[in-house]
Amino acid sequence: IMLANKPNGFNINENCGSTCPGDLQQLVIKNNADLGIAYDGDGDRVILVNQDGAIIDGDAIVYILAMHLKNRNKLNNTGVVGTVMTNMGVENALRQHQIPFIRTSVGDKNVMAKLEEQGWFLGGESSGHIINLKKTISGDGIITSLLVLNAMLEQKASIDELLKDYQNYPSELVAIKCEDPQELIKTVKMQKLIQQATKDMGNKGRVLIRASGTEPKIRLMLESIDENLINTMLPELTTKINSIITEENKCSI
């Protein structure tokens, strides 16, 4: 069943694809399909939808591919590269199976660079950029989806069965407007806030505060198995970051 397959030169990614899979989710449920596949406009990203209409993002896809290779002794003692945004659930699940996992900065070019540096071949981003250097030299959504389908066929398993040992940690991401995020993140006040927030989270999760590379914003992400902790810390940190932005703006006048 095809969806959003009538391009006119202007409607690329318009209410469809990996960044807007809502219609696909409904179509999967309506047709009792086993799987939905959403690519982005240039085909280098892919997001999946299970039979219940739930999103399976790039983190879960990387886990599926890594485990399939591991179970068939094809990982060849290598590991997986993710980014600072990759869910902790991936890291913990892979390490439970003795699969090394390392993070790099956001961006498929950074994933590629880290793979080459480590001599590994599998990595990806939550957004659905998946790289398998055994199959292609860049992210390719079609190849990635075929590899997932192959894993389902070879293991005679549904997509949910392939993910039965994978637990995605609850997370929240907010973007806070800031004129010069690259400079703000370097300030003493921001560095102290990051250190304190990391200490407060402890081993219950992860705090990521970074400058956006594409927009004038500070990105704040909290990730924890304890949702109550996220709900408590998120508004507190948002308020503190906004206060620092206000104070720094006053100092620069």
Segment roles from a protein language model:
Residues 95-253:
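Mobile late-domain/C-terminal helix-loop "cap" segments
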Residues 1-155, 168:
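Phosphate-binding chemistry for phosphorylated carbohydrates and sugar-nucleotides
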